[in-house]
């Protein structure tokens, strides 16, 4: 969300000898300043730190969780690093941190009362509020009568944020 401001500040500070980084939120850094500034540049430019897939899922009866597990197994068989989160059990901050770290994100959710299962909807709004971008996204929707979660998830993470959306063929 504040990537432009952070990038501008780091550009101005590039000629200075920085001995300490004192963020408003988080640790005060006195060592490895170059490495810390590099991290801030990654985060400010929304550049993934690693190639890999975050799979975040919300499941009511276990079927969406099963689909997420199958996807994770197939990706791992291909040698792709994955991490999974049940958004009903995992604090959103863990998923947000992983989303900033990895290059690809999969969101799998059940349609619940003609909407997105609540914890997934909250996570997606949190990611949108962080202005996370420059990721490849895929969505898995699960529903019987009138599945809508896929469409609704795409709407929350819609442009102007810069994402590449994968579509099933």
Predicted feature descriptions by range:
Residues 22-49, 122:
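Short N-terminal or domain-adjacent regulatory/targeting segments
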Residues 164-169:
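Conserved small/polar residues in nucleotide/adenosyl-binding loops
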Residues 1-23, 28-31:
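Metallo-beta-lactamase
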Residues 91-162:
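Helix-loop-strand module that forms the ligand-binding subsite of alpha/beta enzymes
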